[in-house]
Amino acid sequence: MPRNFLLTGHRGAAALEAENTLPSFYKAVECGATAVELDVYPTRDGVAVVVHDEDLSRLTGVSALVTQLTYAEASRLRVLGRARIPTLREVLAMAKGRLSVDIEVKKPGVEREVVEAVRELGMAQDVLVTSFIPSTLEAVRKLDPSIEVGVLLEEWDDEYLAIAESVGARVVLPHYSAITGELLQKLRGRGLSAITWTVNDAELARKLLGMGVEGVITDNPCALRTAVGL
């Protein structure tokens, strides 16, 4: 796997800055993260923006769906009262040359915009597009086979081996509770890599890395890097 997702900051450095904002991604760089994970939705006018919740109530205090706002409207809001919602292009531009990027697509309909942003920034070799939605991963691969995709999952089922094969994924991203030695052996047998989420405990991170996962996603890359010695 050419991209480096060994230590991936979840939504940047979500424990330290307003999640999925530019300050959070810059903090991940300061922490020594090798990559960041982010979430993408389309605005009403088709702009790929970086935000975890479609309903913006928790993050901005405004009861609105980001998919029903224009980008101009969404950009006026402040995440946790601190920073604005960035576009995917802004985050990719900031990450280029600094970080690999795990782009989680939360909802179908933004795949083309994601692919175009990755192409424009020349970052196909530095990104991994992930989703719980197989059709989204399939759409990304059809638009640009050079962009790697990864299958997100919470609980393991062997059907995910077939899903990974059908969408052309070389990476699966199970929740850490699903990771077992048997699972990792199955994945290696199919030529698949594993990145796991969301790991905030140093002891757990050491165990998972010792078992052979290729990367851990964490809310606090500063603390985990120091504690585990990454």
PLM features: what roles do these ranges have?
Residues 1-230:
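Phosphate-group recognition and catalysis centered on beta-loop-alpha active-site segments
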